[in-house]
Amino acid sequence: MPKRLDINTILVIGSGPIVIGQAAEFDYSGTQACQSLKEEGYKVILVNSNPATIMTDTATADKVYIEPLTLEFVSRIIRKERPDAILPTLGGQTGLNMAVELAKSGVLEECGVEILGTKLSAIEQAEDRDLFRTLMQELNEPTPPSEIIHNLDEAYGFVNEIGYPVIVRPAFTLGGTGGGICHNEEELIEIVTSGLKHSPVTQCLLEKSIAGCKEIEYEVMRDSNDNAIVVCNMENIDPVGVHTGDSIVVAPSQTLSDREYQMLRNTSLRIIRALGIEGGCNVQLALDPYSFQYYVIEVNPRVSRSSALASKATGYPIAKLAAKIAVGLTLDEIVNPVTQKTYACFEPALDYVVSKIPRWPFDKFESANRTLGTQMKATGEVMSIGRNLEESLLKAVRSLELGIYHLELDHLKELDKETMKKRIIKADDERLFIVAEAIRQGVTKEEINEWCEMDFFFLQKVENIVNMEREVKANVGNMEVLQTAKEMGFSDHYIAAAWNKTEREIYDMRKGNNMTPVFKMVDTCAAEFESATPYYYSTYADENESIVTDRKSVVVLGSGPIRIGQGVEFDYATVHSVWAIKEAGYEAIIINNNPETVSTDFSISDKLYFEPLTIEDVMHIIDLEKPEGVIVQFGGQTAINLAAKLEEHGVKILGTSLEDLDRAEDRDKFEAALTKLGIPQPVGKTATTVEQAVAIAEEIGYPVLVRPSYVLGGRAMEIVYRQEELLHYMKNAVKVHADHPVLIDRYMVGKEIEVDAISDGENVFIPGIMEHIERAGVHSGDSIGVYPPQSLSEKLKEQIIEHTIALGKGLNIVGLLNIQFVVFKDQVYVIEVNPRASRTVPFLSKITGVPMANVATKVILGQDLVEQGYGTGYHPEEKEVYVKAPVFSFAKLRSVDTTLGPEMKSTGEVMGKDLTLEKALYKGLVASGINIPTHGSVIITVADKDKEEAMEIAKRFHEIGYNLLATAGTAQSLAEQNIPVQVVNKIDSEDYNLLDIIRQGKAQFVINTLTKGKQPARDGFRIRRESVENGVACLTSLDTTRAILRVLESMTFSAHSMKEITQTKRHEVVHA
């Protein structure tokens, strides 16, 4: 059936900011879909609130709206643009929920807009737990015994009948938000209450736990002619009970018999047909390991995280084809873009094994509960490809960016058998490492299987790795053993430690013995047809399939998995750099290992290597390709950290030289450079021992800002107010020694300014200056950023521009640089300089129209700024006001403190733009998920240091009609200022107290600042967590509170009696 000609304009709904459960995979799928629809000649309009994505580039669609994904704003765009149809199935859960809201509000009917891809009825049947269960019963497909509940009493009724454990699955939520497994009444009350709150339709499914079954996923496609295929099936190494986004997954499935595979395949195809889905769909199934009994867990009637993984695992571009199917094309009409010979109706075949391991944020949030369950906690993931499962798993382990090179963690060696048993039964992020450790200590596979029901096949593979470790240690220098270890995926790093050599010595030993990997192609058809895609993975085998051309090439290092501090912004910069390399006439080669991103789409670069970003894996590619050089500026800290080792191997680092990178990152060298340039910075020194740190802090004077050198996202950064806190930090947060010094700075409470610039060594061009709403001390990634600056005098702006130009030239920067300044007592100080792409590059590129990563790449390749039409100086400011607001995923991470500080906590960002700061702020805050009601109650509990400042804020809330609630201490201060306030009980009171008010939704905002010294923070911590669990905006910075007040004041009219007005006027005259 040819494509539809009765529709011309299609509105694509994006997925909004990156949160846990919805990451960069939707930038990849959304970008693919928009391009796919444009190829077919449709006019594409995109709405998305996330400025950090390729998807929101103006070239991706015919019209791009970066606006909040709320009913109010999307309806407005629909009424203005009058599209013929909307495509919501590529915007994750956000897109689906938006489609349902739009349909229910009547705006689609009013404007005659059709939903493409998955019909509304199918979305509701798949997402509404009750309708889905009914459909499964009609199809005779087994689901676990379950009950739909809308309150706690109904939950009790089900549990009394069926017994514990039970699984709670809220309807219409993302990444299992609010759900979990309940083993007793206490957990039932907590999880059901949370689930009902998070479900937009106040509905949960309670089902008998089938934890322990194998969890299998099928990624299926169907078109309007009822052709349906399986693109990929995947198996979770973790049995049912751990969210699939938190599971280690392999593709294709490894432990199914042909009968089991076909049985589950038929079920998946029967379900997609019954739902009438046109496009992609993900079916999750549970299989009893001891019989042919299976259960349908759930269906995602959209492109999902698993479809991004399946696309990268097979090379079959699901989102691209789903978009074509949505407009009427059928699988037998669409050519497979990989082979360019076969059609899309051929099911992909794999002759390799793919492993995906999630990347969790527990290195950032040490206090978080690390236990894994049905609510997702990972921020991102890595994928690797190998010829056997051992190789594939070990490659994935070293891709995680945790400084791990093998399935082994030193701190687990101390664990006794009982502790290991507990942690294997109750899964956490280190379970696979603990399984390996247990096998090393002699625990049998049978015992481990009894503890966690992980399949014997997977346990055998881990045992194979452990046995090989013993072989390696027993045969130092043996080349045959080395060959076998390399075929199994062992790293040079591991072997070097076992043989008491350096990694370089092992590398040289292998090269001397011709023991190097070859590169195989990912071709969707197990080499049955010739493939046209340059998409490769390494393995130790015979034939190399990566053909080196005679064109000059440049390698770009990607940024690895999405994690807090290094998000999709770096992928954005990587992709733009690759495009610029191609424009400059070079062959662009990319190395990365993140299956969710646009950069690992094989159509982006000339060659894609899906490999770990370690020196060994990168050098294999460089040895083969012999590029002109490597660009490290766009891959965040991941790539920068490889620069020194690459140079040791004789590889040319393009752009800012290694020496100059080091000058910006090394404290003492940086200080010397600033002194030479005459640029002031806060007083600070470097400590390499605890005693030194104490002495420096005494000399500088508290409060001080402490942090390790060479970090991204403010890892382990803290503001310390007294000596015992400093000692606690030195003991717990960092391991200080000569190679890992700790930086100690005077903490200045001033306005923070951020600048991104491009330098070619001679000229320094500044596209934009951003002002942070929160004072210095809150990490720049967690601050609300405003462009152009709203409160900087021209004199200060000139100072900032002068300092930026001097730093660009003085540090010999070639490419991008990011500088953070603090304005303190009308003086500009430099806090830090990052000689690389920063997380504000996409935001500023979109606002100013300067394609920063593109321009910087061309500068790196030798085309100076003047040649490109830019000179030294500041780009003219835009008329509109733009706000970048952070988005957090606290609802997914229990027991993480929400207080903002120098360590970054946000997972994503949104943009708000309008003619005034207030309107732009309103859009930014609403897009980030903060509800802004114009009246209600605000709870104020602030630290003594903030009381004076909080008075002015409280007064302004009162003036716009808000009711103020406070505990005794704060209430007294308010009463003394004649501000009406209602006293509420502290949280340790047995009577109705502050937490009850939050739980019952009687407060719209909670203002809670941290007491100096962090110890009495436990009360504050409970208040902040309770706010998050109940969806109440909790403001831990008075600057953010002021920003919200500006918005509220602009939306509401203050009401003053005439007498008040005349008194104010008389007052003004007296002062005249």
From Swiss-Prot:
Residues involved in Mg(2+) 1 binding: 284, 298
**Annotated ATP 2 binding sites:** 707, 746, 752, 777-780, 820, 832
Region (Oligomerization domain), start-end ranges: 402-546
Biological process terms in GO annotation: 'de novo' UMP biosynthetic process; glutamine metabolic process; L-arginine biosynthetic process
The residues the record assigns to binding Mn(2+) 1 are: 284, 298
UniProt-annotated binding residues for Mg(2+) 2: 298, 300
Q: Which GO terms describe its molecular function?
A: ATP binding; carbamoyl-phosphate synthase (ammonia) activity; carbamoyl-phosphate synthase (glutamine-hydrolyzing) activity; metal ion binding
Q: Where is this region: Carbamoyl phosphate synthetic domain?
A: 547-929
Query: Where do the annotations place Mg(2+) 3 binding?
Result: 820, 832
Catalysed reaction equations from the record: hydrogencarbonate + L-glutamine + 2 ATP + H2O = carbamoyl phosphate + L-glutamate + 2 ADP + phosphate + 2 H(+)
Cite the binding residues for Mn(2+) 4: 832, 834
The UniProt annotation places Mg(2+) 4 binding at 832, 834
Q: What's the cofactor?
A: Mg(2+); Mn(2+)
Residue stretches making up the ATP-grasp domain: 133-327, 671-861
Provide the family line. Belongs to the CarB family.
Quote the record's domain comment: The large subunit is composed of 2 ATP-grasp domains that are involved in binding the 2 ATP molecules needed for carbamoyl phosphate synthesis. The N-terminal ATP-grasp domain (referred to as the carboxyphosphate synthetic component) catalyzes the ATP-dependent phosphorylation of hydrogencarbonate to carboxyphosphate and the subsequent nucleophilic attack by ammonia to form a carbamate intermediate.
Which HAMAP family does this entry report, sorted A to Z?
CPSase_L_chain_A, CPSase_L_chain_B
| The protein, known as | Carbamoyl phosphate synthase large chain
